[in-house]
């Protein structure tokens, strides 16, 4: 039952009045031409008066930090901003229950924390039941969670308090990533069953002996070694860019990516990460400045020309796929470049073997999992033999098993094939575990450029860039 009503007796329209839903992909929820129109849409359908519309839109825009965005097109916003607009559009109609599918997937750590605090406020002050579906368990646990339900193989594998779930190692057993601090406690030799308030990092209650164990473990961790940087492969020199009728996002911006690096590009939502990638790949053109690939100026190269050197994989593979069959999708780029069929077949098969997709070469893409589709889009980029691969949120929305498979594949690609990898991510765990360099972007400039450990021990950078 839902709110005491048998679900079998409720159609989709009825359900929409009982449960407000925020989808993982906010673009699929937008109906208004501006943020204000989109947030107000439900109230317009309810035939609310204009003054009520204005008051409630202003109220939720203030709560979700959307005031400066009300006149913008939803499609022009960053992923995190889109998420907040979708949330406001649901909350404004006073639904009796709220369901969120991967609400943290597109948010930087600080925005995610703010989102969780808002949900906590809705539960505690508005008495609104909230159901959260998410893989980013550590961030979800930033607020009090009453109950955690783990599903596996079509059944309920666990239904308990978060603290008991963590103490019983249920997450790892069911392919979910446990909070990093729990992993650290285990590595230090601490019996997590004896730790009080294990589900609350801020209130974690360690005994004196447990604190000593943890301190000793941290002190004995191996220190990362400085490595000599290779030659530049991508160099941005004096890059300036602004969207029409807006202030400059980049003003005489400089950045160098070195050959063979596995780098992470991080920063708060809306700080220019996606814009920067679009400038590198050619989807946007700078007002001034130069883009070098090695020693070659590629500033005037087309998107197609740059794709031969720089592969780009979007966060959502469904936005990139244009063919029905796996082979056809991976072969498309070669066919558009006039490569003969025999060469195309060989290069596609070689690429499918590298990406672990060769057994599925004759499969329809619709039969694949999200993670496998992601690999197809990577294969479609790799078949052109680019020297650089740029990925937007490579592991977003994936469980631990698919997360590990994807990252192991990228590491092998980097180490064995020599491919330079640039990952745009909000996942600090991913950055710490896999990147050898972190570039922190803030308001169109490089705030920090250092090893991941150095970035995450700089409190000023963490606060300014919303990394924690």
Please report, for each region that a protein language model flagged, where it lies by residue.
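Conserved ABC transporter NBD signature motif
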Residues: 1-6, 15, 289-297
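Conserved ABC ATPase "signature" region
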Residues: 51-69, 342-360
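Conserved ABC ATPase signature
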Residues: 73-77, 81, 364-368
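Catalytic Walker B motif of ABC-type/P-loop ATPase nucleotide-binding domains
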Residues: 98-101, 389-392
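Conserved beta-strand-loop-alpha-helix hinge in the C-terminal portion
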Residues: 155-181, 445-467
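The feature captures the beta-strand-to-loop junction immediately N-terminal to the Walker
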Residues: 266-268
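Helix-to-loop junction immediately C-terminal to a conserved catalytic motif
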Residues: 281
């Amino acid at each position: 039952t839902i709110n005491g009503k048998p679900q079998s007796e409720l159609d989709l329209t009825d359900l929409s009045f009982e449960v407000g839903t925020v989808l993982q992909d906010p673009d699929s929820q937008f109906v208004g031409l501006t943020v204000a129109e989109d947030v107000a849409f439900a109230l317009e359908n309810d035939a609310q008066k204009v003054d009520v519309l204005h008051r409630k839109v202003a109220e939720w825009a203030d709560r979700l930090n959307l005031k400066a965005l009300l006149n913008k097109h939803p499609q022009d916003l960053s992923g995190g901003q889109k998420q907040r607009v979708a949330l406001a559009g649901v909350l404004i109609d006073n639904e009796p229950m709220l369901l969120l599918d991967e609400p943290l997937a597109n948010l930087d750590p600080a925005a995610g924390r703010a989102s969780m605090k808002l949900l906590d406020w809705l539960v505690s002050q508005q008495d609104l039941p909230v159901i959260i579906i998410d893989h980013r368990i550590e961030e979800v646990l930033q607020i009090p969670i009453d109950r955690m339900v783990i599903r596996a193989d079509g059944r309920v594998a666990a239904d308990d308090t978060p603290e008991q779930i963590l103490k019983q190692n249920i997450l790892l057993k069911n392919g979910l990533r446990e909070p990093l601090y729990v992993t650290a406690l285990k590595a230090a030799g601490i019996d997590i069953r004896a730790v009080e308030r294990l589900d609350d990092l801020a209130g974690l209650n360690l005994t004196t002996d447990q604190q000593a164990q943890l301190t000793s473990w941290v002190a004995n961790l191996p220190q990362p070694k400085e490595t000599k940087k290779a030659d530049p492969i991508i160099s941005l020199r004096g890059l300036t860019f602004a969207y029409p009728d807006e202030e400059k996002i980049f003003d005489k911006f400089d950045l160098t990516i070195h050959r063979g690096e596995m780098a992470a590009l991080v920063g708060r939502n809306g700080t220019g990460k996606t814009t920067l990638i679009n400038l590198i790949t050619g989807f946007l053109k700078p007002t001034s400045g130069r883009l070098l690939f090695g020693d070659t100026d590629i500033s005037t190269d087309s998107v197609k020309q740059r794709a031969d050197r720089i592969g780009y994989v979007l966060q959502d593979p469904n936005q990139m796929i244009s063919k029905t069959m796996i082979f056809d999708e991976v072969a498309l780029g070669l066919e558009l470049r006039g490569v003969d069929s025999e060469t195309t077949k060989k290069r596609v098969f070689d690429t499918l073997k590298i990406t672990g997709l060769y057994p599925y070469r004759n499969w329809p893409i619709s039969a694949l999992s999200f993670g496998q589709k992601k690999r197809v889009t990577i294969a479609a980029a790799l078949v052109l033999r680019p020297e650089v691969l740029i990925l937007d949120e490579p592991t977003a929305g994936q469980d631990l098993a698919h997360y590990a498979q994807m990252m192991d594949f990228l590491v092998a690609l980097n180490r064995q094939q020599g491919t330079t990898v640039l990952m745009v991510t909000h996942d600090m765990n991913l950055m710490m575990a896999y990147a050898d360099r972190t570039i922190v972007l803030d308001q169109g400039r490089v705030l920090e450029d250092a090893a991941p450990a150095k970035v995450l021990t700089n409190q000023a950078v963490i606060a300014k860039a919303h990394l924690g």
